[in-house]
Amino acid sequence: MEHQELNELVKVRLEKLSELRKMGIEPYGGKFERTHTAKEILDNFEQLVDKTVKIAGRIMAKRGHGKASFAHIQDMSGKIQIYARQNELGIDAYKLFEKLDIGDIIGVTGHVFKTQKGEITVWLSSFEILAKSLRPLPEKWHGLTDVELRYRQRYVDLIVNPEVRETFILRSRIVKTIREFLDQKGFLEVETPMMHPIAGGAAARPFITHHNALDMKLYLRIAPELYLKRLLVGGFEKVYEINRNFRNEGISTKHNPEFTMLELYQAYADYHDMMDITEELITHVAEKVLGTLEITYQGTPINLHRPWKRIPMLKAIEEATGVDFAGVKDPVQAYAKAKELGVPVEEGMGWGEIITAVFEEKVEPTLINPTFVIDYPVEVSPLAKRQKENPDLTYRFELFIYGREMANAFSELNDPIDQKERFLKQLEARAKGNEEAHMMDEDYITALEYGMPPAGGLGIGIDRLVMLLTDQASIRDVILFPLMRPRD
């Protein structure tokens, strides 16, 4: 719709608003006592036929035939037809009904019947205006197809695209089901700080803010991990948090700077237990919310039936490339092998960083059905417990579905001396320009020095899980109000 045309339509509606007020009608009404939703009437027609009902909603379509008019109104449950006739409403009220616009929100009283065409309808005896719409909705045959506009004006998107509403209803059910599952397993939901004096718990660039009263720099949290593990030190044995993380990074179909994570920690467990609970949790959610473990994502069938494949990173790389990096521990030789494979690596990278880059380039995109990739290098896992039998590797896994990371977990490092040494190595990386390397967190080291029980920890990206289970191509399609660059 052209800007000038839109302005003209808004002008006409403002004039109607003025007319209503001159008539003594308040176009922004108060409470309206509904007896039913649209869906309740449609589902219970036999019990409600000829009964009086009161419903409210937004006018989505309207057509008139002289002294009678039909309209469709929409509430959160769906749409239902209403029928207005001059004989029942009276001349003045019917004229007012005729002047209603698509987008107006009204409350109606009437009896339930079925038209000659068989459509369940409410025959109006009265109505009232609850909110006058001053802007026209997108024309129904076009809908709201401008993707960027859909994100900027999500409120309009939700009005005109019922499938978008359904996605966010499913999101709510998914999160609720996760909470119920963990609560039944004996986990305690907790809340940890959103503003941290030290950014930690993940390799990411933080958002920085300033606390005026304390005159100190603070970081929006990139992960709650180090606070949740402090709770293990304090004696809590099974904790979880579902909340927002913030990372000052690029935006893509898989990344939004503000996103929702589930993190859980279980004392006296390890990464095998975390694999088990991840499988059980995601399959439980899929069965409860979707009713199936065989889903289709972006046209690709995915089988969620257990057990899921588990494969060491080095073995996955060897199967994909033919190169056994377990026998190429020298970083210079590993660098040369990676270059031969066409993997973008940089001189000076360590062995663990190189094989991780090879994995991400050559293996990750091929992992369509759920796959746990286990035993990550210690260089890229500064918070994971080192393997006794192979100290270059850790007891860590990531879960991949459709070539995307869905979860990250490990047997937690609880040795304060080892943890401090790894933090120091991360500081060296920061000094060389790696803004995502961990900062030193002395208080966390102090906590570990009091003794933290061995534990398994798990993080699942809620947004990516919702994308998978609702078949949405972009993370923005599962976040109600994704971050957008302001318009000029």
From Swiss-Prot:
UniProt cross-references to CDD domains, sorted A to Z: LysRS_core (cd00775), LysRS_N (cd04322)
Binding-site residues, Mg(2+) 1: E398, E405
One MF term in the entry's GO annotations: catalytic activity, acting on a protein
Subcellular location: Cytoplasm
Entry keywords, A to Z: Aminoacyl-tRNA synthetase, ATP-binding, Cytoplasm, Ligase, Magnesium, Metal-binding, Nucleotide-binding, Protein biosynthesis
GO annotation terms (biological process): lysyl-tRNA aminoacylation
InterPro entries, alphabetized: Aa-tRNA-synt_II, aa-tRNA-synth_II, aa-tRNA-synth_II/BPL/LPL, Lys-tRNA-ligase_II, Lys-tRNA-ligase_II_bac/euk, Lys-tRNA-ligase_II_N, Lys-tRNA-synth_II_C, NA-bd_OB-fold
EC numbers on record: 6.1.1.6
GO cellular component, one term: cytosol
Cofactor remark from the record: Binds 3 Mg(2+) ions per subunit.
SUPFAM superfamilies in the cross-refs: Class II aaRS and biotin synthetases, Nucleic acid-binding proteins
The protein's name in its UniProt record: Lysine--tRNA ligase
Gene transcribed to yield this protein: lysS
